[in-house]
């Protein structure tokens, strides 16, 4: 079996590339996916988001090694093992990232990936419902909407931010990210709008696109050229050959793992596992980054939260309405207001993100509070801690060793202390007076630096945004894995295009920029002239040097 292009992974970037590489009919594409079909309400119902990320059926089941700086806790790292990859198990929050994120990419060696370069690709991919005119795309495959439940707590959160002196923004994906405002969702007609729904399923209707179910074991190389992929399907091993190129889009965990199993990575590490060296790229698996967050929870004095809808009868009613009409509380992820703010004067653009939720519960659906409540998920966006993904053995079936080194930099602790205190300030504003009860978490007894640090150590959680393990950079950067056209340095016919190539993590959730990577990489792969650069200038707070708001 062979095709012009072989893509490993049907996730956010992989699905976008399958769509774009095949759209003019000139080239054939095979997408290799080990996961299951994305069928059923547990995947497609937005409100059921906590289920697929906790199910072996849909998730690779990765966890970090015990993390020494957070009390030896091992945090889960869900990655989608399903059509659509992690876009089929994520929280459906849509964030492009800040313009300065991409300018930093370009300045660090990923030339051609500045905000002016990537904005046209965000516009090409979007079908934005209600975003800022002129800044958003309206004809792309990816539907993006605002929340529709209109809970008064969403408005209270935005108003509280305003009362605290922060900016308000009507579209954080437009000209102005900074501020409090409505959150955007990848939901369409009441259904999760994953990369599979947006890109892959339309592409699979074309005669030149084929989906192959199989477990990718390694890249097949002839000398220093990639010519195919060895896959395992059942008990059968076979090679899918690529006439032009192999493209890895297997996630920030599996992409570096696959490179190393194929002899591309740190020479000493590969030798340790008896793997023949093809290209010594010390950056493979390094530079691992993530977003962490804590949940600040308050009791609510009015019965307007989702607590009353957590019982079996209400869940059944919500499920029936969604199954019949794709409306109601089942048709949203319930993240409908958000904020991006700066932590202090001298910070040029937001470095803290908020998700607001009208219930007190864990993100994975476990440990709901036993009363009406609401919460903010809050965390710093630019942690200085860095980790790694390495091989446990040369057996492709073994999970890799994942070490995030969470909270290993002292600045991360100071940033989180500020997040806790800032959230208390916001929840203390007059807008919440009609609703605010006692603090559930951390609790009124947690006040000093040491007490807050202990709370963070015990309760900090991953936002599930791993990235950076196949860093994109200049060819002469010894830690770069791919060049600015996503080509693996030192190997021909092989590219990586997914969140693993991010030089530095972006502001916000990663599904949006991962799809953008797939869109832009497609033009590089096809040898097309990139879309014309934008001349639009993003808003930067004129007070950034003297104030945090």
Swiss-Prot record:
Gene3D superfamilies: FAD/NAD(P)-binding domain (3.50.50.60), Glucose Oxidase, domain 3 (3.30.560.10). GO terms for molecular function: betaine-aldehyde dehydrogenase (NAD+) activity; choline dehydrogenase activity; flavin adenine dinucleotide binding. Pathway: Amine and polyamine biosynthesis; betaine biosynthesis via choline pathway; betaine aldehyde from choline (cytochrome c reductase route): step 1/1. Its EC number is 1.1.99.1, 1.2.1.8. It is an enzyme of class 1 (oxidoreductase). The keyword Flavoprotein applies. Its cofactor is FAD. Keywords: FAD, Flavoprotein, NAD, Oxidoreductase. The active site is at 465 (proton acceptor). GO terms for biological process: glycine betaine biosynthetic process from choline. Pfam families: GMC_oxred_C, GMC_oxred_N. FAD binds at residues 4-33. It catalyses: choline + A = betaine aldehyde + AH2; betaine aldehyde + NAD(+) + H2O = glycine betaine + NADH + 2 H(+). Signal peptide: none annotated. NCBIfam families: betA, PRK02106.1. Belongs to the GMC oxidoreductase family. Involved in the biosynthesis of the osmoprotectant glycine betaine. Catalyzes the oxidation of choline to betaine aldehyde and betaine aldehyde to glycine betaine at the same rate. This is Oxygen-dependent choline dehydrogenase. The gene is betA.
């Amino acid at each position: 079996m062979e095709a012009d292009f072989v893509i490993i992974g049907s996730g956010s970037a992989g699905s976008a590339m399958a769509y774009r590489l095949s759209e003019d009919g000139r080239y054939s594409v095979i997408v290799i996916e080990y996961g299951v079909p994305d069928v059923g309400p547990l995947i497609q119902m937005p409100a059921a988001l906590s289920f697929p990320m906790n199910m072996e059926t849909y998730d690779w089941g990765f966890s970090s090694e015990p993390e020494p700086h957070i009390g030896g806790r091992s945090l889960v790292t869900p990655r989608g093992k399903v059509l659509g990859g992690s876009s089929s198990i994520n929280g459906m929050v849509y964030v492009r990232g800040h313009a300065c994120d991409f300018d930093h990419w370009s300045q660090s060696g990923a030339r051609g990936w500045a905000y002016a370069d990537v904005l046209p690709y965000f516009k090409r991919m979007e079908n934005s419902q209600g975003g800022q005119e002129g800044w958003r795309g309206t004809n792309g495959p990816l539907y993006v909407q605002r929340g529709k439940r209109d809970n008064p707590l969403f408005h209270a959160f935005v108003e509280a931010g305003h009362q605290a002196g922060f900016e308000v923004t009507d579209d954080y994906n437009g000209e102005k990210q900074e501020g409090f405002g409505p959150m955007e969702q990848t939901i369409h007609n009441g259904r999760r709008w994953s990369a599979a729904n947006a890109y892959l399923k339309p592409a699979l209707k074309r005669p030149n696109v084929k989906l192959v179910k199989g477990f990718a074991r390694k890249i097949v190389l002839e000398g220093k050229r990639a010519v195919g992929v060895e896959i395992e399907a059942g008990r059968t091993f076979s090679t899918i050959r690529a006439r032009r190129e192999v493209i890895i889009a297997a996630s920030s965990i599996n992409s570096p793992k696959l490179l190393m199993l194929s002899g591309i990575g740190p020479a000493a590490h590969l030798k340790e596992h008896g793997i023949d060296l093809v290209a010594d790229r010390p950056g493979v698996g390094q530079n691992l980054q993530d977003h962490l967050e804590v949940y600040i929870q308050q009791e609510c004095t009015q019965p307007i939260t989702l607590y009353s809808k957590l019982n079996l009868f209400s869940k059944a009613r919500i499920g029936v309405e969604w199954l019949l009409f794709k409306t109601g509380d089942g048709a949203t992820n319930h993240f409908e207001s958000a904020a991006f703010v700066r932590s202090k004067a001298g910070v040029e653009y937001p470095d803290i993100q908020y998700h607001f939720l009208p219930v007190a519960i864990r993100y994975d659906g476990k440990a709901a509070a036993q009363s009406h409540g609401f919460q903010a998920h809050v965390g710093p966006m630019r942690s200085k801690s860095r980790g790694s993904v390495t091989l446990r053995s040369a057996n492709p079936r073994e999970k890799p060793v994942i070490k995030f080194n969470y909270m290993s930099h002292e600045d991360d602790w100071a940033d989180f202390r500020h997040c806790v205190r800032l959230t208390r300030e916001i929840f203390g504003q007059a807008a919440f007076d009609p609703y605010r009860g006692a603090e559930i978490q951390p609790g009124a007894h947690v006040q000093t630096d040491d007490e807050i640090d202990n709370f963070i150590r015990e309760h900090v959680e991953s936002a599930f945004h791993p990235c950076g393990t196949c860093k994109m950079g200049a060819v002469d950067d010894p830690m770069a894995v791919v060049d600015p056209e996503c080509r693996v340095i030192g190997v021909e016919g092989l590219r990586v295009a997914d969140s693993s190539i991010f030089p530095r993590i972006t502001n916000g959730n990663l599904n949006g920029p991962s799809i953008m990577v797939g869109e832009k990489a497609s033009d590089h792969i096809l040898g097309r002239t990139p879309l014309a650069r934008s001349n639009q200038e993003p808003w930067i707070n004129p007070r950034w040097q003297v104030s945090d708001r």
